[in-house]
Amino acid sequence: MCGINGIISKDKNKDKLIKSMNEKILHRGPDAEGIFVEGDVALGQRRLSIIDLAGGNQPIYNEDKSILIMYNGEVYNYKELKEELTEYKFETESDTEVVLHGYEKWGHDLPKKLRGMFAYAIYDKNKGEIFISRDQFGIKPLYYYHDGDTILFGSEIKSFLAYPKFKKVLNKELLGAYLTFSFTPTDETFFKGVYRLPSGHSMTIDVKKRKIKIDRYFKVEFGNTDKSFDEVVEEIGTAMKDSTEHHLISDVEVGSFLSSGVDSSYLVSLAKPDKTYTIGFDLAKYSEIDYAKDLTDKLNIKNISEKISKEEYMNALSEVYYHMDEPTADGCAIAVYFLSRLASKDVKVVLSGEGADEFFGGYNSYDDNFYTKLPFFIRKSMASICKILPKNKITRYIIRRGLPLEESYVSINRTYYDDELKDVLKIDNYIKNKDIVKDVYDEYKDYNKLDKMLAVDIRYWLSNNILTIVDKMTMAHSIESRVPFTDMKVFDVARMLPKNYKVSDGTTKVALRNAARKVIPNDAWKKKKLGFPVPIREWIREDDFYKEIKNTFNTDISKELFNNDYLIKILDEHKNR
């Protein structure tokens, strides 16, 4: 895994600029640096050596040096693809060169052939264009900025700060979306003028005209298998075994994150890495160390654990937000930060369980309870009555469940509804939440309720939050994360499952749990979801954490954007609860 940068500009100091951009992402690749400067184009790369340690430095050129690549990621089917590229001469054993020659053969159809995680830039001098692609689910990040004369792109926004004309302007219109989703769900970022290339998309830059064209090459599709439950369970097991084996391809040691849940326990039971890593906290219900140790003892592998204190957590916040580039309200970001720090002492590569919930139905919200099973016209009528009653937890729930799905469900982690944001924000020109997800709901209008929810969460929650966190936090410590659940062959199985194979009678990931049950030697296959639990709710009630948050609310920028009295009221209510 690595980090890439690029600048297309008339600026005469591009060689220094690209060097400075690379320095901003040194943590993504401390092993080697690659730079290319010619004409209006400057490309950079920082390398973390994982495959072909000696021969994989970049840029890598084709045979006549008319095409070159800067690449971040791992393509796990590169050996199979290489067999289809026998007409080309290979100078290395790296997957990077396979991607380069794959472009020569398949052109812009290349990303459709790739199985893995990637964000690469291929400069085709013959066409005068740079072809950039991001993997199907957004495992690897890619951002870009275009001010008319200059185009910047890179793995992290912070590299753009090296460009003197880049202005750091807060994109206030995203505040409403952030408060609702707890992350930035849009292609726009909190830096005005900076965008993320969406997952499953490619971007073509016309170097001379400074034009950008974005195309989608992958769409999430759902079906409905007619296979029996036992057949599906067997199919999941086969796909996961194959994916795990491919994700273990490496010239360096591979470890694994491990919690007490089914996803990471399944991965560890399949991969059996020499070392696994777990963090916990002093409060027993927030520590998964004992569960992890039980599993690794049964598998006869090593578990390395660490307990994180409240003070360590607080002290890490600024470092975490620096590496995230944008704000996140997801406490697991800090948990993954400490996990990555722990693992980085031993290994360069770790397996992690992201993607299982979004593919196989891992959230309770996906299942209907007694109330949501009522006909919509009844729920809508009940909501109308509750609107004139005093507001409390019950009436708010009934009102929300009286909305159509397109308005009631925008994210698995929804915090605010549009009509509640006016109490929090002083600005009123924020993007409405239902407008953010409208395109997805329009595109999937003919699918069932669960598939619509999965499509929303794969597009936003998985790509822009979960996978972004695991990439940024592992890269902060110069290690590579690999996510075997978020794999095209695994998804091809998951996308065909009917609802009752995913969620049923309060049980999530029904079929996946049954596949995991066959290889996990303890009862982790049936444990309820915890994620990476962090005791933030308890800590906020303690004076030091409470005062830190209250002081933040009282800053000038906070007073400019938020209704501080309302925020402090919520904070005090939580502290005194």
Language-model features and meaning:
Residues 1-74, 101-221, 241-245, 268, ...:
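N-terminal glutamine amidotransferase
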Residues 8-16, 87, 126-151, 207, ...:
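ATP-dependent adenylate-handling active sites, centered on carboxylate activation for C-N bond formation
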Residues 86, 104-108, 521:
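Glycine-centered helix-coil hinge/cap
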Residues 88-94, 109, 168-172, 231, ...:
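Structural motif
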Residues 91, 215, 304-306:
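General small-molecule cofactor/ligand-binding pocket signal
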Residues 431-443:
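A short, charged helix-loop
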Residues 462:
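Globin-like tetrapyrrole-binding proteins
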Residues 520-575:
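PAPS-dependent sulfotransferase catalytic core
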